[in-house]
Each structure stands twice: as structure tokens, then as C-alpha cells.
Amino acid sequence: IAIFEKDGSLRKNNASSVVRGAGAEASVMSVKADEHGLYAASYSRLGTFEGVMRLNWVTGDIDYMADCHGDSYDVLPAGDVVYAASHSHDCSNIGGFPDVSYHYHNAVAYTNAATGTVEDNHGAGYKNYAGQNATTNLNFYPDFTPGKISGAIQATWTVEGNDKYVVYGGEFLAVNGTAQQGLVRFARRDIAPNKQGPMDKGGAFKVSGSSPRAGVVSLSFKANWDRDDKTLTYNVYRDAMNGQPVTSQTATAGFWERPDLSATDVVEPGSTHRYRVQVTDQWGASTVSDWVTVKAAEGQGLSKYGARVLADGAAHYWSFDETSGDKAEDFVAQRNLTIRGKAYKRGAGSVLGSGASLGLTSDSANKSHAATRVASQAPTAFSMEAWVRTTSTSGGEIMGYGSSAANQSWSRDR
């Protein structure tokens, strides 16, 4: 790539010292420009650079790169977004989707700015651009059915647009499951119909229910996904959908990183209820699961305090109400604790006046503690409530995040 001065002389350009897009099986396929810089779309069969990058007009440096494996054929800068015609199959180097059996994405979008740095290369046979400025792979994943006229099994070849629409051209037969041949137009968000909702629809969105203890119903479901919205809202309804949901939560995830979600409801022990989960994007497009019927276990129900904790929307709740064993159940997210050490006691009365308690010791020879089996990312801020009775006057940590579940954590948050 070369940038020329007005008099025809060559302007200093540092891009070629980083990216080499030339040779028998590598090329810069398209170059576009705007006031921010010069944009290039590249392919390579020699393991150099595939993806999109932006060069700075003044310095000749690479402002950012979208190090996404898979040929890129054309690029369109459109304000704060850059669109590419490609068959991208691995954007994990910039925090995007990973390579899954070479599933091609023929239209992708990126933030038109540097948002971080490229990670160490995740794919064999490609050059490592770790540390270079990177952009972000946006949640824009239309699905194309490729044609066969060229034999390249490539759906999109070009992308153009204006301040209202983005247009892809190529040899495709359908888009998002609807017949659409060779040319397709996508509207910008503010004028788009915004009818593409969560993709696992109706009965395909699976919800399971159980009752782990008296009067408590636990629902489990995997996060849904959406072609153009990464954040979805999950409302859980009991018996009917004409009132307020039992619980509501949001989850932000790409199609490749869908977490397991859960919800908890407190009802009369022995009662039977139907539950349904509605998933909605920020534009109102939604789907609902089938109803799932759950009978709450019989017996002594959750205490008034525990019911209030759940009603307040706690992310986790361990009551330590079990009278035996080495487990402490999480009533909200099923992140159960394992009690470690020998010097612990169960079944004594609780300081809350009802239920049982867990007795631990910090004695150096007989330490005991409780921890989750699976690690999770510590949040930057959170609140907690714990009821404790102690005879110690030396103080110490009651609850927090640490680097070890089995032993003393050398890295912890408090």
C-alpha cells in the first residue's frame, strides 16, 4: 500500500513493515478512504494478514487491524462502523468468534477505532500480530447461502453504502433463510425494521426446571443469541404472562460464548406451577419458550429471611441450612460450595433464629472454609451480606474471591 503526496512523491508509510500483503498467494483486494484514513481488505494463503486494517493519513502507521482469519474482499467505512465482505471464520485474535469447523461469516462489521490490542495468534499457520492496535468485532452476523457460479463457495464479493443503507453484492441465493439473490440491502439501525429477534425460537429455546428443596423452584436455560444484538433480556413468568415476571435478568454474549443461566422462584411447598421464559432484544423483538411444569418439593419451606433475599434479586444465596454433608447449596445460580477441612460443624442453630448454621474454624492446625468448585471472574464491585458469630478478636476475611478453592489463596480481593 502506498500513499502519495500531491506532487506525486511517496509519503512515508510504515504499514509494509508490519503487514506484507503481496506475493503469489496474498493480496490487498480492496482499498477505500475517508477523512479518518485509508482502509484495506486482504487475503493470504501464505499465513500473513487476512482481515481489514486502517492506515493513518498523516503518520502512515496502522491505526488498527481486524486480525480475522478468512479472506476479506471488500471494505466499507461508514462513520463509526466498518463493514467487510469476507468469509471470516476466526476473529478470536481480537476477542471475536473462534474458528468452529470453518463456518464462514460473509458479512462482518467492526468498530471504526482502535479499542485494544491483538492477542497472541490462536490459529496455526498465521503470522502473530500480538500487540498491534486492534478493533472490535461487532455483533452483526447475517447468514448467506453461497452460490456456485464461480466455484469459490463465496457469497459476498463487494460492499457499498451511504448514510442509510449498506449493500452487499455477490453470488448468494438467500440471506437469513429468505430467498435473495446476488444483491441485498441492510438498513442502518435508526431506520431498520429491527425484527431480527433471538434465534432459538419457541420450543427450540429449552428451559428445564427442578425443585432442589421444599418450596424452591430452580429453572435452567442457556443464553439465547441474536444476529444483531448482543444483550438480551430474560423474563421468567409463572402460570400466566399477564402480570409482572417472577424474575428478570440481562445477559451479554456472542453466539459462541452463550453462558448457562438460571432463575429461582419461592412458592408453597408441594404446589405445582408452569414456567415460561421470554427473551427480548432492546428493540422489542422476542421469543418465548414452551411452558415447563415443576412441582415444588414438600417439607419445611424457605425461611422468611431467605425468601426476602431471593425477592431482593441476590445473585447468589447460600443459607448453610443443611444439617450434614460437605455441600452448601446456592439457591440462585447453583454455584454450590464445597466445605473443606475437618474442623467444621453443621446443624447448630442459626443467629437468625431459625434454620441451621455452619461452624468453621480459623485455627492454624484445623482450618476449614467453603468455596465454589469452578472459578469465576471477580466483579469490580459487589455487595454482600453475611451473618456471623465469632469469639475471635483478631478480625479477618469473612467472604471474598481468591485464587485457590482448596487451600489458602495467595491472590485475593481483600
Predicted regions and their residues:
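Extracytoplasmic surface signature
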Residues: 1-301, 312
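Residues within well-ordered beta-strands of beta-sheet-rich folds
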Residues: 220, 274-278, 317-321, 381-389
